[in-house]
Design a protein with these regions (language model features):
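Key DNA-contact positions within bacterial/archaeal DNA-binding proteins
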Residues: 61, 113-114
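The short coil/loop that forms the "turn" connecting the two helices of the helix-turn-helix
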Residues: 58, 110-111
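Membrane-proximal linker segments that couple transmembrane helices to downstream signaling/catalytic modules
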Residues: 2-94, 98, 102-103, 119-122, ...
């Protein structure tokens, strides 16, 4: 007699996902992209699926269904993807080279450093710091030269 009854987990689609009209789902997908990406709501730490649903006049279950079916990920992963993409740009931008990783995390909408690092690593298979260092090693001419600000003639005359 076996002690454990182990069965293989069956992959099944949530029933509510199949009830949504595909045409309506495509329309909602475009509206979600407009709000999250074009309006850059992904930068808002407090912009949840609930707030998105309110803005679209629907419920969170419907938002979840559309994001899962059309983007093949959950809402949090969907939003974090755009945050990470922007962070990648900032991390290698000479203008932001002096920013700490935590500051970049805050700029793109993560609530804390830990979730930023975890999301970044999950998507890129490296830490944000390693990503920045790798870029700088591959493009050494891209480093910002730290020089003292020169005094203008006006500043010199005021001394």
């Amino acid at each position: 007699m076996t002690k454990y009854n182990i069965t293989e987990k069956k992959e099944k689609e949530a029933h509510y996902r199949t009830l949504v009209n595909p045409k309506l789902m495509d329309e909602m997908k475009e509206r979600i992209l407009d709000i999250i990406v074009m309006q850059k709501k992904y930068k808002d730490k407090d912009y949840s699926a609930r707030k998105l649903a309110e803005d679209l006049g629907t419920n969170t279950r419907y938002i979840s269904a559309v994001v899962n079916v059309r983007f093949h990920m959950n809402y949090t992963s969907f939003v974090n993807k755009f945050r990470i993409e922007e962070a990648m740009t900032i991390l290698v931008d000479r203008r932001y080279q002096d920013l700490r990783i935590e500051e970049v995390s805050d700029m793109v909408g993560f609530a804390n450093r830990q979730s930023f690092y975890a999301s970044f690593y999950k998507l890129m298979n490296m830490t944000p710091r390693d990503y920045r260092l790798q870029f700088l090693n591959l493009h050494p001419g891209e480093k910002v030269k730290r020089t003292k600000k020169k005094k203008s003639e006006k500043d010199k005359s005021e001394e």
